[in-house]
Structures are given as C-alpha cells and as structure tokens.
Amino acid sequence: MSCTVKNKGREEGEYEGSVIGQNSSSQNGLIASSSDLSIDESLLVDPKMLFIGSKIGEGAHGKVYEGRYGDRIVAIKVLHCGSTPEERIALESRFIREVNMMSRVKHENLVKFIGACKDPLMVIVTELLPGMSLRRYLVNLRPKQLELHVAIGYALDIAQAMDCLHANGIIHRDLKPDNLLLTANHKSVKLADFGLAREESVTEMMTAETGTYRWMAPELYSTVTLRQGEKKHYNNKVDVYSFGIVLWELLTNRMPFDKMSNLQAAYAAAFKQERPPIPDDISPELAFIIQSCWVEDPNLRPSFSQIVRLLNEILFTVAPSPPPLPESAATTSNGTIAKFSVPARGKFSFIRQLFAAKRSRNLQ
C-alpha cells in the first residue's frame, strides 16, 4: 500500500523558478539534517548549478520539474521532506535507496541517472525525456489502439529494462504506465521512478508499502489483516504480474478493471482471482504471455529473460516490412545497387516460409 507524505513546509509551485542552492530550509527545520545519509560523494551534484523550472509531474513521494543543471536541460525530482522526525528518517532512507539503485544500473530503456543532492533539499536529477508518459499517450490515443508492432515494441523495451533490474537484484514494485516515459520520437519507452524499488535477497521480508492497486500483484496486499509497516514475503515476480497488466493495456488501450474502484480492483484480483478480459483478437501467443505473467502462483510466472525471448519471436513476425527497393534491388556495403535475380528472390521467400513453419511446430 503506497504511503503519501505531503511536504507541509511548502505551498504548491513554491520551488518553481528557484535555485536549489539558495537557502530553502523547511518550516519544521529538518530539511538540512542529513548527516545520516550515506551516498557516495561522486554521485552528488552541486545544488548551486541546479535551477528548477515548471512542474511536469507529481507522485506520492515527490514532484518532478523540468530544470537545468549547468547548461543541460534535465528532470529534477524533489522529494517530500516529511513533517516529523520519523517521517524524515523514513524518507531519507527511501532517498538513499533510490539514488544508490539508480546510479548502479544502466540500460537504454532505463531513465539515465545524472546525480543527486541532499542539502538543502533531497533531489534526484535525471535525463529529461521530451516525450510524455505512456499513460498520457494511451489516453490521448483512445479510442484507437496502438499498432501491434508498436505495442509489442514498447512491451519489449519494458521487459528489457525489468530484466536489467532483476539481474541486479532490484524489484521495482511500481511498474505501471505512469512510470514509463516515451522518447521524443515515440519510438521507445524508458522506465523511471525507483521510489518504491527494493533490493532483493533470499531472506529479506519487505514491507507491504507498494504501488498502485490496478497493477499490483495480489500477494502484495492479499492478507486482510496486514497493517502498514508489517512484513511480508514476496519476490521479484510481483513485477512480472504488473508487466502482464501493462502488456494487456498496451494491446487493448483500456484501463485495467475500468468498471471498478482501486479497492474493488484489488479485492477482485486477490480474493476472486479476477483478471482483465482478454479480447478474442489478441493472438494466442500474446494471450499466453499475459496469462502466464498474472497467474496466481508467483513461482509459475516467467522470468523477464523468458518474456524478452518470447516477445522477440513475436515481434519478428509482426514487424512491418521495409519499403521495397526499386526493381527488387538491394544496396551493397559500398553503396552500389545489386539486383536480386528471380531465383534468389525465390530462395529468400523459401527461407521465410521455412522459419514460419518451424515456429508453428514449436508452438504446437
């Protein structure tokens, strides 16, 4: 269950147009008390070089602004500082985790970490993607759907990013379209927001604090008596469940459990084993991935490396063909045009048919 801690020391928009390095201690006097933070000095940026512009997003744990770091346009996430010493300690711990995890994983489908500062505000600086969130993009597109090869391409981007996190022992716990950002040309997707991420170990028991119900795995909240702060066992397969919901959404462009409130969706998924309906026009291969991701038993869900392999196979068959070259010609490495003979074209056609037949047998 996510915990919203509001920054009571500042009014809406107060950070906009400000330089972080200026004196901006909070109303409760705790903003500068950061001696317990243990972040490598090489990860810190000079707050005097940060300038906060307009707000571009907001989550449970902070606000995100467009800004500038030196001469570079960046995204600046200002974390809530809490209104009590206890809140401050908890939020500092989350800040440390997020910075350390973002700094150690690098992938083309993960938002690039630039740096952080801890005084006078807890701030994380990342690359700024000029596109929009996947959530907003899908909403703007409705009632139309994504083209199939685009939807699968986005899903592959997400699965590759998650595979990288899991390979580094990190559970994201908040995988949803709001935390997925499009590049400027809308060609690919990058995963953002490590605010709820956790490092995974075999013996660790993690808190029930989690992301948004509609995308959450049932094992995160299925114990009725579980109170905030209590411990509960789960593993990285909670991200696989969330991915299954996101993949369904990419293919249908519908809100999961759209007829239900958040709590109704949680109850239906956890106690009635309900899942969003899979339309008939979704291929059996994609339906299989979705259903295997959100199966009740976490141990039966696939790994992201398996999901990546399956999606790659499907994408190969649905990707749009490149425009034909004039007169069945192909460009050679030295830039000259070489024409394919009729027998050569027939040979390539035969190879494509052979591959399709082999794949069909494997699926049976």
Regions found by a protein language model. Give the residues of each.
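Activation segment signature within eukaryotic-like protein kinase domains
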Residues: Y154-A155
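Catalytic-loop of the protein kinase fold
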Residues: H166-L182
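Regulatory alphaC helix of protein kinase catalytic domains
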Residues: F95, V99-N100
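A conserved loop-to-beta-strand element in the N-lobe of protein kinase catalytic cores
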Residues: D119-E127, R135-R136
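Short beta-strand micro-motifs within the conserved protein kinase catalytic domain, predominantly
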Residues: K112-P120
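Protein kinase glycine-rich loop
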Residues: G53-V64
